[in-house]
Regions:
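Short beta-strand elements of extracellular/lumenal beta-sandwich folds
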Residues: 46-62
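Short acidic, flexible loop segments centered on an aromatic residue
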Residues: 61-77, 82-88, 136
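Positively charged n-region of N-terminal signal peptides that target proteins for export
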Residues: 1-4
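Glycan-processing catalytic domains of CAZymes
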Residues: 71, 90-101, 107-114, 123-129, ...
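Short tyrosine-centred short linear motifs in exposed loops/low-complexity segments
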Residues: 47, 62-64, 125-129
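Low-complexity, acidic Ser/Thr/Pro/Gly-rich terminal tails and inter-domain linkers that flank the onset
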Residues: 24-46
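Buried hydrophobic-core signal for structured, non-transmembrane domains
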Residues: 52-56, 119, 131-134
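Bacterial N-terminal signal peptides
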Residues: 7-17
């Protein structure tokens, strides 16, 4: 759950755009409505009844009466009336985190009154096209939005006894996705799903899942492996006030599932990103070497599923400046890193591989990483001005990456970004930072992926920077950068990773739980909601 400060942005709608489609009504004012169209499924499929939805947000205090009409493309059959009426608006409760274990959640109202319209539709054959949703009403200028239609081929209906076995895509690269373990029902330090629900396009293919469920973990392993991703870099948080004491940590359920509980754990790797910036890091070198590191060695590094490169466990230090501060300066930090290497060698490894986060382009932070004994540097994400176009975003990302590489101070692990958009947290939590919104759409994402691959292939053969790639981000549903399959983009981003970085044919069959007769996985979240109500 990282933080980034970006310029403020005005976000009209995440998915649909409002456009005048007829001459202005006598009111002659822009439509106040915000339209968010989405498919209920992350993977609509031919031969199956699917649902098209639109969430209509009404920022005014008026009780508007609307006619909402869906115009389908040829080949898509409507099973409900094309025009439906909206006259009732409501603001549902949102249960937002206080980031405080003793007083974890507070009840707030949704930002805008809203209503959702749903149509059942069907296509007999695979189909691509565009549907249009129009909204009109007395005193409201007509508004329209569109939604891509992409029905995958029909599958024979089956009920699988478990998550279907992954068919891993072959790749020569070590591809990892950064991973936030914040989606366990009722986790007091995390936002949870409630603030995300007003953004229905962000709903994952797995639904509002409970991350505590190992079956959810196995779906994530399947999705990752089948698109060339072979490890997750998982955020790891020490408990507040725990520095200097035997280790206690929070949100460790995902690491436990991947290493110990998932059925497919032997096929996948994980490593930890030490989030030492907002909760406790270490009190001093003694705490690092006698509390924290031994805990990691025994509980994580010695597990077969923990990522090692050249027999060195991989660890990310998110806030290197805090690490230096807590150890009493750069020289002390370097000495401690040397002792971490010695301890890992004594435990049977070849040392430890430490990577530190830095997303800027100035040389001084990279030089500090060198002086502290870091093995490499990477960017968690990229800070992009919200007013740049998607094409400019490609150039800005690559300019940032190339400047850090050309500095030549230490290996730079490339990061392939999705974007940024923490609007759910800004709207519904005590989010302390500013926010912007930018998105690398699939076409731009493909361009960046191809350029990063070219850059990696130009690096010394066998070097870390030629082998390792990080994706930003797997599941930051609240921060607004997420490559995992969801309603908004399906498998589009993962398929691009497979196309660019994997061997063999790009053709493959993606599955969602309903294809296998599995799920839903939201029982934990729904049960928790009842306790809040």
């Amino acid at each position: 759950m990282k933080r980034i400060i970006l310029p403020s942005a005005i976000l009209a709608a995440f998915v649909g755009s409002l456009i005048a489609a007829e001459p202005p009504s006598p009111v002659s004012e822009p439509s106040p409505l915000i339209l968010k169209p989405y498919w209920d499924s992350a993977l609509p499929r031919a031969g199956r009844v699917e649902s098209v939805c639109v969430r209509i947000e009404n920022p005014t205090d008026k009780q508007l009466a609307l006619d909402v009409t869906l115009t389908p493309p040829a080949g898509m059959k409507l099973l409900d009336p094309a025009t439906q009426q909206v006259g009732k608006w409501e603001k549902k409760p949102v249960y937002a985190t206080n980031y405080n274990p003793s007083n974890p959640f507070r009840k707030v109202e949704e930002k805008n009154a809203n209503a959702t319209v749903i149509w059942r539709v069907e296509a007999i054959e695979p189909l691509t096209g565009t549907l249009v949703i129009s909204v009109k009403g007395e005193g409201v200028q007509l508004a329209q939005t569109s939604l891509p239609v992409d029905f995958a081929a029909a599958l024979e209906k089956t009920v699988s006894p478990y998550v279907p076995t992954p068919v891993a895509a072959e790749t020569d690269y070590l591809i990892g996705a950064q991973y936030f373990p914040g989606w366990r029902a009722g986790e007091p330090i995390s936002t949870g799903w409630s603030p995300i629900e007003p953004y229905p396009e962000r709903k994952p293919a797995l639904g509002w899942y409970d991350e505590d469920n190992p079956e959810v973990t196995d779906w994530e392993i399947k999705y990752a492996l089948e698109h060339g991703i072979n490890f997750f870099l998982i955020c790891w948080y020490r408990g507040q006030g725990n520095a200097g004491k035997p280790v206690e940590h929070i949100m460790g359920h995902s690491m436990d599932n991947f290493l110990n509980k998932a059925k497919f754990r032997d096929d996948f790797k994980v490593c930890l990103s030490w989030e030492n910036y907002s909760v406790d890091g270490v009190s001093d070198e003694n705490d690092l070497l006698n509390n924290l590191l031994p805990y990691w060695i025994e509980n994580y590094f010695k597990k077969p599923g923990y990522l090692k490169v050249d027999n060195k466990p991989v660890v990310s230090i998110y806030a290197l400046h805090k690490f230096v501060e807590q150890l009493g300066g750069t020289a002390n930090a370097r000495s401690a890193v040397g002792k971490m290497n010695d301890a890992c060698k004594a435990a049977g490894f070849a040392g430890i591989l430490l990577i530190s986060e830095y997303r800027g382009t100035e040389a001084a932070p990279l030089q500090m990483a060198v002086e502290c004994g870091m093995d490499a540097s990477y960017a968690y994400c990229y800070g992009i001005d919200e007013d740049v176009s998607k094409d400019d975003g490609v150039g800005m990302v690559m300019n940032n990456l190339n400047r850090r590489v050309k500095a030549g101070l230490l290996p730079i692990i490339p990061t392939l970004p999705h974007g940024w958009g923490p609007q759910p947290w800004i709207d519904y939590t005590n989010y302390p930072f500013g926010g912007g919104f930018w998105r690398v759409g699939p076409p731009a994402f493909r361009k960046i992926a191809a350029q990063i691959k070219e850059l990696m292939d130009s690096q010394p053969k066998g070097s870390l920077q030629s082998r390792m790639l990080l994706l930003d981000n797997w599941n930051e549903w609240g921060e607004g950068h997420y490559l995992a399959p969801c309603r908004e983009h399906g498998f589009a981003y993962l398929d691009i990773v497979r196309d660019i970085f994997c061997k063999g044919p790009s053709e493959h069959v993606d599955l969602v739980p309903e294809d296998a007769g599995r799920g839903p996985y939201d029982a934990g979240y729904r049960s928790w909601l009842k306790t809040q109500k």
